[in-house]
Every structure is written in C-alpha cells, then in structure tokens.
C-alpha cells in the first residue's frame, strides 16, 4: 500500500486567445523564470507563422503535432536480481502529452536558426506532418520499447 497520498491534478485555466487548455500547458512549458507574458508572445507568434505557412487553423495544426509526437510506449529501468532491465511500459495519457510538448520544445531549441519563434513554428509544422526531430525522438523511444519487448513480463 502506498504511503504517500494521491494528489489531484491542478486544473489549468485555458489560454485567453484560443481557449485551449492544451495550449496553456504548452505556454507554461515554454516559460522560463516565470516570464509568462514572454512565453505567450513566443507561442502566439509561432502559431501565427504556422497559420501563415500552412493556411490551416493554427490550433488544429498544433493539436495534430502533439498527437503525432506523443509516445505510446517507453522503457523504464527495473532491477531484478542484480541486473537492470529496460522494461517497456505504456505511457499514461497526461505524461504522453507532457513528453510530446517537452520533445517539441527541445527539438525547436536544438534547431539551427536565429529566432526561437521561427524554429518553434517550423518544428510544430514538421511534427504535424510526421517529420522532424520530435518524431524521430518518438520513433527512437518506440524502437527501444520494441527492442526490449522480451522483458515486458517484468512489468509492475
């Protein structure tokens, strides 16, 4: 029986421009040192660029990018008799979205270019089209889980 209490997830109010809770979570992930207005400006500018380049509604493109980048499986280390096995496990829905957002931001930061807004917009478009570094990261995670499928019976 767990000793710690089970905590409720905080409800995040939707963002003011699009009314999306998912987008508000993304803004919070982009934010550094509590500068939320800067993070909002960056994300909204990136979405404007996405709308300009694709000609589609930016929120739909963003949601498609998050959906495409979300991993279904990941590996977790499990120690059994002195050996550590990488055990494939299913990813919880909330963590799935969080990982997709984190990978999207990391990939945008690692991209070559000058402005983060442009890099983020390009990465969102790539992820929506099932290409780019974010999708590669998801595929690598799935590949690791598939390679360690033999240890799936060690799940807890």
Swiss-Prot record:
Pfam families: Ribosomal_S7 (PF00177). Keywords: Ribonucleoprotein, Ribosomal protein, RNA-binding, rRNA-binding, tRNA-binding. SUPFAM superfamilies: Ribosomal protein S7. GO terms for cellular component: small ribosomal subunit. GO terms for biological process: translation. One of its GO terms (molecular function) is tRNA binding. It comes from the Bacteria. HAMAP family: Ribosomal_uS7_B. One of the primary rRNA binding proteins, it binds directly to 16S rRNA where it nucleates assembly of the head domain of the 30S subunit. Is located at the subunit interface close to the decoding center, probably blocks exit of the E-site tRNA. Part of the 30S ribosomal subunit. Contacts proteins S9 and S11. Belongs to the universal ribosomal protein uS7 family. This is Small ribosomal subunit protein uS7. The gene is rpsG.
């Amino acid at each position: 029986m767990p000793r710690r209490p089970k905590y409720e997830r905080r409800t995040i109010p939707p963002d003011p421009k699009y009314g999306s809770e998912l987008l508000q979570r993304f803004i919070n992930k982009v934010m550094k040192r509590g500068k939320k207005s800067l993070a909002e400006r960056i994300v909204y500018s990136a979405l404007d660029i996405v709308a300009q380049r694709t000609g589609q509604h930016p929120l739909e493109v963003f949601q498609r990018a998050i959906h495409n980048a979300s991993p279904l499986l990941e590996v977790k280390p499990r120690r059994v008799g002195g050996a550590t096995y990488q055990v494939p496990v299913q990813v919880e829905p909330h963590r799935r979205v969080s990982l997709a957002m984190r990978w999207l931001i990391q990939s945008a930061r690692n991209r070559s270019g000058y402005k983060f807004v442009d890099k983020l917009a390009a990465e969102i478009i790539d992820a929506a089209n099932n290409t780019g570094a974010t999708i590669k990261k998801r595929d690598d995670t799935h590949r690791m889980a598939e390679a360690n499928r033999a240890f799936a019976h060690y799940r807890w």
